[in-house]
């Protein structure tokens, strides 16, 4: 699949979607985008910058949601123009999709909204590639129905993203079989390595997380076979205004990417023998 300036798929090198969870300031956006671009260029990893103008699903109304649509889009447009990278942001049911699609390169749908038919189809109609996050409550094979809804309105530039499965209260687990199953949709599969270690609502009014396990799950996912990795990052996760406990430190990102790139090259060179046994 053609995605921004590169090809994305199981037969293509790993790509990265990364950035702070939420747009905190223009300076932070520019700094992180610039550093990530430099890292990825040095490693030969295609890169899409991600950050949100509004986090509508925060645990509490007291939590920071973002800078809002107008200011957020202005900053994303500046990142795109001045840093020279494609940008992705998430949208919601009340988002003016045409306005957002005029600025960003990729639209992302939140996991909680993956079953909302009208929403998925409206986003797909906006004319941009879409990264559809699988709900924490959804079986991997049920993503075929979600993809079909998006394709029905004429959008073939669809990615599916695994971000963990609810496992009791305040806990997520990652079933790597789901990555192989979702390949059956014919869409590039992305693994969200940072939200997969989130502990939703685990700190009462905020979510917790176990960022120390980000590389563990990222290595496992890339070894299983994915088109891309999604990993939110922050120069100082302890001070991040959203999802800090599961954000990967920016200063440690290059080391992680080096490992993932090596694993990706090996498994894609060898191929995926499981396809001989899985139903088409």
UniProtKB/Swiss-Prot annotation:
Keywords: Cytoplasm, Lipopolysaccharide biosynthesis, Transferase. It catalyses: D-arabinose 5-phosphate + phosphoenolpyruvate + H2O = 3-deoxy-alpha-D-manno-2-octulosonate-8-phosphate + phosphate. It is found in: Cytoplasm. Pfam families: DAHP_synth_1. GO terms for biological process: keto-3-deoxy-D-manno-octulosonic acid biosynthetic process. It comes from the Bacteria. GO terms for cellular component: cytoplasm. This is 2-dehydro-3-deoxyphosphooctonate aldolase. It comes from Thiobacillus denitrificans (strain ATCC 25259 / T1).
